[in-house]
Amino acid sequence: MVNIIMVLYSIFLFLPAFIANPGAVITGGHFILDRGKTIHGKRILGDGKSLSGFIGGSLIGVLAGIIVYYIIYISNIGLGNYGNNIISALPVLFAMSFGSLTGDITGSFIKRRLGMKRGAKGSLLDQWPFVLMSFLFIFIFARHFFLEFYGNFIAIILILVLTPPLHRGVNILGYKLKMKDVPW
């Protein structure tokens, strides 16, 4: 039987992956990853993917995870955490955050191959690659955590369902705050 509280808790634990993406928008813009290079006349990634955004966004995700870790630790919820201590939590947080932005970059790469320009609405290509790559990184680098919180796949499915409206809302906010050129 599925424990709904554990499923919701697992979604809460995924916050670093969600926060890494807007963190990349805040810190991005310096040292464009593809340096303007093309494949068959199409940009590899585009100007929206930068080293400063990748590293800065990932570190913001890790920082968010450290905050979540201590909230859980202090509140003594008893449902588990990223690790037994902050040091053992770091591989999970790094895998989740860097995986998230690796997925975002992968989505951009696919969009460019399909001929979609930067800022073009890519629907699920804008929304799911960061989630899926984050889970892949967690599975590879923190398998014990993955199996404990996402092994039954129900939380993964719910995160995939919740991501499109959440992603849209965050992008609208970024657009209204003049941090994004388009609201998607």
From Swiss-Prot:
Role description: Catalyzes the formation of CDP-2,3-bis-(O-geranylgeranyl)-sn-glycerol (CDP-archaeol) from 2,3-bis-(O-geranylgeranyl)-sn-glycerol 1-phosphate (DGGGP) and CTP. This reaction is the third ether-bond-formation step in the biosynthesis of archaeal membrane lipids.
Transmembrane segments annotated in the record for this chain: 4-24, 54-74, 86-106, 122-142, 145-165
Family, similarity comment: Belongs to the CDP-archaeol synthase family.
Location (main, coarse): membrane
GO biological process, one term: glycerophospholipid biosynthetic process
EC identifiers of the protein: 2.7.7.67
Gene Ontology CC terms, in alphabetical order: plasma membrane
Pathway where this protein functions: Membrane lipid metabolism; glycerophospholipid metabolism
Known catalytic reactions: 2,3-bis-O-(geranylgeranyl)-sn-glycerol 1-phosphate + CTP + H(+) = CDP-2,3-bis-O-(geranylgeranyl)-sn-glycerol + diphosphate
Membrane-related topology note: Multi-pass membrane protein
One GO MF term: CDP-2,3-bis-(O-geranylgeranyl)-sn-glycerol synthase activity
Keyword set, alphabetical order: Cell membrane, Lipid biosynthesis, Lipid metabolism, Magnesium, Membrane, Phospholipid biosynthesis, Phospholipid metabolism, Transferase, Transmembrane, Transmembrane helix
UniProt keyword Transferase, yes or no: yes
Cofactor requirements of the protein: Mg(2+)
Nucleotide-binding as UniProt keyword: no
Organism of provenance: Picrophilus torridus (strain ATCC 700027 / DSM 9790 / JCM 10055 / NBRC 100828 / KAW 2/3)
Domain of life of the native organism: Archaea
HAMAP family: CDP_archaeol_synth
Protein name listed in UniProt: CDP-archaeol synthase
Cell compartment(s), UniProt: Cell membrane
InterPro entries recorded: CarS, CarS_archaea
